[in-house]
């Protein structure tokens, strides 16, 4: 077999491969002999059909099948011989495809980039330091109570925080507009659900009262037909209800799957969950900075085929997440291009880190992570057993741990500074990472 390789760009390779005619004929004859043993042709006993008849009927299909398989096999042999790592399926262009002659074709494809990780010392990481204080637990208890607020109907003027049952009709230039009317809508004053001035305009209203609100839609309103326009809303208040926060008792605790009657035990459980959330938030922010630093320090040219594959995966995920009747291929690729490039680039960099620093999953860390995941469930022992009994899930945990070990390896060499912050600041979502 003859092979020549040409680099047409940093990652694109062009292989010209020649397969001897003798090898082709051997494969064709092998298929014809297999066909002869099972062919059923009128006038001949099974297995006794003359080869000339078999060849006349089946040679063309046998040749096409043989050529297809030989192209696959010879391409694989060629990339192994040339020590190439294809990053996607090749584009095959036949040059000589005639009976009796050597098969010659050109395969064009991309290869994985070859690079070494550098610049770890230049990566700057700010590692947050925080604790869960008693005041943080107090705040969390209030948040949980507000999330489970009940409303009790009252006979008085409406105040901020009250829930109103209202009917309203909105008009622009004297005409009702789509989506501008509703009946029996529940609205909490001060929630910011409606455009500016709507909720404030109902403060002081009583059940049975009607008010007309003259308002203006924001210039950046999502409905461009209404953006910046003046509108009038005729509002009827059906009822006014005030918020009632639930008591911190056993009934309230049971809403969160905690079968405790004492406030101290509930606070301890909430505090434990907050500690877990804090650790995860700090770890996530450190990881994001490390990955951003690796990207900045190691610019890598990424095969287009890998990005296209990742775009397709993200399309499928989007359809599964948001549903609807849309097909993945109908979603514009541009929507996912930056995210796909970042994910693929980081995947290549992380894989190179694992290889370069000879990293392997630390089984003690795998066990710790599984136990931490399991601690969020009511039957943690069963969750741990499930992970260790499910090879696919266990493999995914090992991948997460390996990625954490990559982060730890970078932190050993990076410029790390610690910063003391409050619990709230530590768990506050970070800004979305920039694309590579």
From Swiss-Prot:
Molecular-function GO terms, alphabetical: peptidyl-prolyl cis-trans isomerase activity; protein folding chaperone; ribosome binding
PPIase FKBP-type domain residues: 161-246
SUPFAM superfamilies listed in its UniProt record: FKBP-like (SSF54534), Triger factor/SurA peptide-binding domain-like (SSF109998), Trigger factor ribosome-binding domain (SSF102735)
Keywords for the protein's UniProt record, in alphabetical order: Cell cycle, Cell division, Chaperone, Cytoplasm, Isomerase, Rotamase
Catalysed reactions listed for this entry: [protein]-peptidylproline (omega=180) = [protein]-peptidylproline (omega=0)
EC number(s) recorded for this UniProt protein: 5.2.1.8
One GO CC annotation: cytoplasm
Gene3D superfamilies assigned: 3.10.50.40, Trigger factor ribosome-binding domain, Trigger factor, C-terminal domain
Localization terms from the record: Cytoplasm
GO biological process: 'de novo' cotranslational protein folding; cell division; chaperone-mediated protein folding; protein transport; protein unfolding
Chief location category: cytoplasm
A Pfam match: Trigger_N
InterPro entries in the cross-refs: PPIase_dom_sf, PPIase_FKBP_dom, Trig_fac, Trigger_fac_C, Trigger_fac_C_sf, Trigger_fac_ribosome-bd_bac, Trigger_fac_ribosome-bd_sf, Trigger_fact/SurA_dom_sf
Family: Belongs to the FKBP-type PPIase family. Tig subfamily.
PANTHER family associated with the record: TRIGGER FACTOR CHAPERONE AND PEPTIDYL-PROLYL CIS/TRANS ISOMERASE, TRIGGER FACTOR-LIKE PROTEIN TIG, CHLOROPLASTIC
Domain notes: Consists of 3 domains; the N-terminus binds the ribosome, the middle domain has PPIase activity, while the C-terminus has intrinsic chaperone activity on its own.
Cited function: Involved in protein export. Acts as a chaperone by maintaining the newly synthesized protein in an open conformation. Functions as a peptidyl-prolyl cis-trans isomerase.
Name recorded for this polypeptide: Trigger factor
Organism whose genome encodes this protein: Azotobacter vinelandii (strain DJ / ATCC BAA-1303)
């Amino acid at each position: 077999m003859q092979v020549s390789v040409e680099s047409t760009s940093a990652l694109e390779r062009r292989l010209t491969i020649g397969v001897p005619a003798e090898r082709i004929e051997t494969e064709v004859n092998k298929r014809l002999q297999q066909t002869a043993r099972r062919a059923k042709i009128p006038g001949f006993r099974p297995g006794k059909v003359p080869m000339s008849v078999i060849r006349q009927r089946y040679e063309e299909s046998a040749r096409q099948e043989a050529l297809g398989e030989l192209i696959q096999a010879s391409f694989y042999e060629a990339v192994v011989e040339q020590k190439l790592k294809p990053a996607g399926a090749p584009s095959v262009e036949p040059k000589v495809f005639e009976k009796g002659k050597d098969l010659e074709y050109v395969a064009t494809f991309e290869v994985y980039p070859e690079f070494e990780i550098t610049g770890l010392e230049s990566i700057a990481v700010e590692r947050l330091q925080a604790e869960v204080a008693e005041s943080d637990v107090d705040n969390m208890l209030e948040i949980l109570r507000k999330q489970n607020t009940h409303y009790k109907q009252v006979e008085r003027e409406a105040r901020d925080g009250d829930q109103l049952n209202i009917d309203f009709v909105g008009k622009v230039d004297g005409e009702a507009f789509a989506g501008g009317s509703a009946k029996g809508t529940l609205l909490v004053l001060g929630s910011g659900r409606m455009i500016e001035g709507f909720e404030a305009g109902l403060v002081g209203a009583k059940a049975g009262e009607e008010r007309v609100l003259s308002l203006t839609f924001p210039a950046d309103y999502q409905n461009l037909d209404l953006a910046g326009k003046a509108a009038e809303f005729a509002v009827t208040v059906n009822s006014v209800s005030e918020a009632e926060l639930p008591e911190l008792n056993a009934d309230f605790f049971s809403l969160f799957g905690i079968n405790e009657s004492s406030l101290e035990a509930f606070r301890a459980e909430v505090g434990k969950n907050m500690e877990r959330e804090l650790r995860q938030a700090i770890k996530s922010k450190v990881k994001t900075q490390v990955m951003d630093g690796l990207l900045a320090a190691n610019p890598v040219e990424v095969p287009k085929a890998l990005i296209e594959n990742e775009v397709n995966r993200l399309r499928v995920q989007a359809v599964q997440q948001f549903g609807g009747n849309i097909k993945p291929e109908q979603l514009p690729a541009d929507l996912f291009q930056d995210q796909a490039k970042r994910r693929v680039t980081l995947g290549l960099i992380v894989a190179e880190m694992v290889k370069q620093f000879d990293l392997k999953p630390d089984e003690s860390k795998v066990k710790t992570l599984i136990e931490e995941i399991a601690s969020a469930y009511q039957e943690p022992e069963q969750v741990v057993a499930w992970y260790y009994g499910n090879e696919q899930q266990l493999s995914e945990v090992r991948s997460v741990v390996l990625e954490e070990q990559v982060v730890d390896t970078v932190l050993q060499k990076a410029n790390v500074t610690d910063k003391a912050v409050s619990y709230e600041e530590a768990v506050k979502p970070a800004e979305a990472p920039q694309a590579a």
